Amino acid sequence: MKEELLKRFTKYVKVDTQSNEESKACPTTPGQMELANILVTELKEIGMQEVTVDEFGYVMATLPSNTTKEVPVIGFLAHLDTATDLTGKNVQPQVHENYDGKDIVLNKDLNVVLSPKQFPELADYNGKTLITTDGTTLLGADDKAGITEIMVAMNYLINHPEIKHGKIRVAFTPDEEIGRGPERFDVEAFGAKYAYTMDGGPLGELEYESFNAAGAKITFNGNSVHPGTAKNKMVNAVKMAMEFNAHIPKDEAPEYTEGYEGFYHLISLNGDVEQAKAYYIIRDFDHLKFVERKTHIASIAKELEEKYGEGSVELKLNDQYYNMREKIEPVKEIVDIVSAAMRNLDIEPKISPIRGGTDGAQLSYKGLPTPNIFGGGENFHGKFEYVALESMVKATEVIIEVARLFEEKE
């Protein structure tokens, strides 16, 4: 199993599937369709049935039931795209066998070092096989580890018919990282009663709560005048943006929050005297606090527009997804069965809220309750991203055990 996981994973991460928020297409980048087509071929090769990919890059396939019992159809999902935070082009995965607990030099020329001083959780991986970047790209374990684990689990079940299971559906979706994954996902065609995203982090993670999420695009329209004659005429759009940000509570940012604490996050700010643009994301687990955060953003925009004149501040505020706990708690047994599967494999479940989002958050609101299971990766979205091969083995085994337990309990 280890060899197959390593071979598939290192193949998939070399396909550049970074999504693009500026694109209106679906998928937003051609690399995602390239990987989708690769997976379609491989799904057919291992013996999956009803293998399809649509024009938008959604891959679906079926592993038929091998039991006479009436077992609910379950699904496993992972996303094709990688994050926009750092390039996913020319990923060169590095394999470090029998990790010794010391610094790992990712890139000598650029002096990029993965160090337990900065990332103390590395101590958990002594003796393990780590797959890292070369220090110039992200790795793409988010979520190609999940894709790999689903592929290997399905191949294992096909080759081990003694493990009884109901009908299993798998899906690989585009553009999750920019919040569009479920937009064109056909829940009815997928046909599962419950599903799981393999999109979590370290070993044991199990999540069924997510942020409520919104995005705020703000355009500041200034007035550029020659600085020599600018008195009482110039309006500096960049300074307007800075003034806007000064109204955001500085301790309510990602770098100062954890657990159930929400935040405002300034993703980007660019512009000049004439015009500046800022993009914030707004996150909170509590719906009332989420609404209050959006109201605060809107009130700052209104206040500044009143100060600088009509049309000086333009705000576009849109909800992205909601906390999936509301949709999963009524069917909490689907979380409990994963906890049982993990314990059967000597994994201690670590149930915590997702300080982020998965396709499962939106899918749960489309009628498909979808908790999130660990994929094994650490330090997602950056050059220090890595995954332990042994964690990928465990995630694969969890998929297999969940399928077995669903059949056993009927």
UniProtKB/Swiss-Prot annotation:
| Superkingdom assignment | Bacteria
What residues sit in the active site?
Answer: 81, 176 (proton acceptor)
Under the heading InterPro entries, the entry gives: ArgE/DapE_CS, Bact_exopeptidase_dim_dom, Peptidase_M20, Peptidase_M20_dimer, Peptidase_M20B
One GO term in the molecular function aspect is:
tripeptide aminopeptidase activity
- According to the UniProt entry, what is the EC number of this protein? 3.4.11.4
UniProtKB keywords: Aminopeptidase, Cytoplasm, Hydrolase, Metal-binding, Metalloprotease, Protease, Zinc
Asked if Chloroplast is a keyword of the record, the answer is no
Indicate which residues the UniProt annotation says bind Zn(2+) 1. Answer: 79, 142, 199
Please give a single GO biological process term from the UniProt record.
peptide catabolic process
Q: What is its main location?
A: cytoplasm
The record ties this protein, via PROSITE patterns, to: ARGE_DAPE_CPG2_1 (PS00758), ARGE_DAPE_CPG2_2 (PS00759)
Catalytic reaction annotation:
Release of the N-terminal residue from a tripeptide
Does the record carry Ligase as a key word?
Answer: no
EC main class here is hydrolase
Q: What compartments host this protein?
A: Cytoplasm
What Gene Ontology cellular component terms go with this record? cytosol
Cofactor binding notes? Binds 2 Zn(2+) ions per subunit.
Q: Which family does it belong to?
A: Belongs to the peptidase M20B family.
Role summary: Cleaves the N-terminal amino acid of tripeptides.
Q: NCBIfam families under this entry? A: peptidase-T (TIGR01882), PRK05469.1 (NF003976), PRK13381.1 (NF009920)
Task: Return the protein name.
Answer: Peptidase T
